[in-house]
Amino acid sequence: SNRIDIERDSENTNYFCVPIPPSVRVENVTIENHYMDRQLWVSIEPEKMQDEEAFYEQNGVYGNCEKVVDGHFEVERKRICLQFQLTDVYEYRSIFEDNTLYIEFVPPREVYEKIVVIDPAYGREDTGAATESVASKDITLNVAKALKEKLDKTDIKVYYTRMDDSNPEAERRVGLAEAARADMLIRIEVNSAESSKQYGTEAVYNSRFFIPGFGSVELADLLEREVVTAISGKANGLIEASAEDTVISEATVPAAAIKVGYLTNGQESILLQRED
């Protein structure tokens, strides 16, 4: 990938300014917030690729660049992708005019009143407990996707630590909740046991940080009751997070993990694989 020139001492403005090739219309520009990586991507798909590559070799970004660490661009067959590394997790507002994309970076708290981070456990080679037909990493991801469908219809802003088969380090998962100043961090896990007779739902809470009002214990209790009610399941109670529960024990925002069921129990294993 090629570096994008950043003019740091440019004019006094609130906006980070990205020049767009003259042949490109607004509907050919897409912005993606890769908040887990603290990156903002601007994708440009011109009607036909001309000398767009040369355009970014000659034209840098300018304006208010204090939240931008650096920038690169990659040219693919039909599109150019500009990738900007940011100093933190931000939301953005954008305006496109005179072939310039004006971007304003805003802390999530300035835009949203309610912020939640959902953390589907496991990922990649860390499958979690697995049977011949399914791995825990897929169950937690499916639960997150189902939650997204519901939560997208509310006024709650939700950040997800993963939405594919990736496995971010525990520090990055916790870091997202801290950076977004989330009201709560909810981790989704799957249980397993030696005995196939064991079943039910448990919630793990962070006991290290006492948060008055609505804290980790209250969150864990609420999660367990909601899940048990929704699936007509059995509540096994609340468990204090141990040092191994890094994501929950390191968080300084209210944090709890909901262990949705036992993959080692025949009946629950079937339930966990159902679409609904």
Give the positions of each predicted feature.
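Short linear recognition/processing motifs and adjacent strand/loop elements at protein termini
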Residues: 1-117, 124, 135, 147-149, ...
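Surface-exposed patches in mature extracellular/periplasmic domains of secreted proteins
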Residues: 29, 156-164, 188, 231-240
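Active-site-adjacent substrate-binding region
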Residues: 215-241
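Active-site-adjacent loop/helix surface patches within enzyme catalytic domains
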Residues: 169-193, 229-233, 244-252
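Solvent-exposed loop/turn segments at secondary-structure junctions
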Residues: 123-125, 163-168, 190-195, 209-211, ...
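Active-site-adjacent mobile loop/cap segments within catalytic or ligand-binding domains
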Residues: 194, 237-276
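Active-site histidine-acidic residue metal-binding/catalytic motifs
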Residues: 100-176, 180-184, 199, 205-207, ...
